[in-house]
Amino acid sequence: MKKFMGKDFLLQTETAQELYHEHASKMPIIDYHCHLVPQMVADDYQFKSITEIWLGGDHYKWRAMRSNGVEERFCTGKDTSDWEKFEKWAETVPYTLRNPLYHWTHLELKTAFGIDKILNPKTAREIYDECNDKLASPEYSARGMMRRYHVEVVCTTDDPIDSLEYHIKTRESGFEIKMLPTWRPDKVMAVEIPSDFRAYVEKLSEISEVDISDFDDMITALRKRHDYFADQGCKLSDHGIEEFYAEEYTDGEIKAIFNKIYGGSELTKEEVLKFKSAMLIILGEMDWEKGWTQQFHYGAIRNNNSRMFKLLGPDTGFDSIGEFMTAKAMSKFLDRLNSKGRLTKTILYNLNPCANEMIATMIGNFQDGSIPGKIQFGSGWWFLDQKDGMEKQLNALSLLGLLSRFVGMLTDSRSFLSYPRHEYFRRTLCNLLGRDVESGEIPASEMDRVCQMVKDISYFNAKNFFQF
């Protein structure tokens, strides 16, 4: 029986152990998509408690606690003490067996704090105090955590109207780890509520210093902000969309739709889809002009619980996997850009695992030989960011594409304790490849190639692909 969370955790063969310990584990981390708060990095924030860094904003844990019968005040309540919240999480952890949270929890305790104990009600106070004692020291600050995990680059997620002041402050401080912005223009496509859209466009007008009175003005303002992001080192965009949009439209129609929505009128469903379709193309062309990589996270049904949405807002644990027949629209969107010669590097992330093989074959339609893996099948995202989800994504890509050209893992996280997800991914990758070598499905004579493949997927592919 193997020791839980031992040095060979998830590594079931000697070859897997060699691949991980001698190669994958030695690679720095490039976290090319995350949701860290830039101000925390700029200010080198010192966390007040393990509850703040671990449970604050972690909707994965909140979902588990609610499922375990824990009252909401222990998840998101403002009048509940840090210890009370941690205690309720410790009571929940034993019930997360076979849930990835059990692995994440103990891997984070081990790698960040050197704690090998199992978290449960009996060990809760001891672990709480030990973590808090360490968090009070400078090496456990926001920057200290990034250094601890050998992070080389992080890309945050930023709105076009963000000032990026904290990226600038961090860079000018001489911090050795790069923190770069990512362009996330979701709100400029959110035309369902006229008042919200108009309020956003007014903010865009203010920060861009462009007087916006029509659609062309809005695009001018967006281009100005796009240029500004590029000046601050941005190399990626990201789009959170329910599905792909590829309706037929004319320029005149889009200008008329803008005038209608900006004037405060509700749009028809058809008009909403046309506007979103046009914006995806325009934004994709902007990214192509600068050589950026565009990312698409699609397939979530968000804010399902309307009562809790009113109480807590978005991103609080009430989202789920959607069912969208999106293959044709995705193909049409990519083809429109490709037909113009304006399809930039692209990463597609699906939330429904039923789409794995669809995406793995879709990316092959638009590889053009300009660079290896120009169109990528993104790593398992959100609910798929776990062992089974990772393996299914890796297997689909292996069978239908080129795994060796994959740009690898990202945290997609708001937490400075989430970097062990890279380790978890690397162990999973090495286990798959090691098993194939030992079963004779990959020749042992190609071991040097397999070793390089592991290092490439862990680090070098991303470094070269994004030109960090």
Regions found by a protein language model. Give the residues of each.
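C-terminal amphipathic alpha-helical interaction region
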Residues: 294-296
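Hard-cation-handling environments
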Residues: 300, 305
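Divalent-cation-assisted or electrostatically stabilized phosphate/pyrophosphate-binding catalytic cores
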Residues: 324-330
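Metal-cofactor-binding active-site regions of metalloenzymes
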Residues: 1-290, 342-344, 348-353, 357-360, ...
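Short glycine/proline- and charge-enriched loop/turn segments
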Residues: 309-317
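A short acidic, glycine-rich active-site loop
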Residues: 268-269, 318-324
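Short, basic/hydrophobic alpha-helical segments
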Residues: 333-339
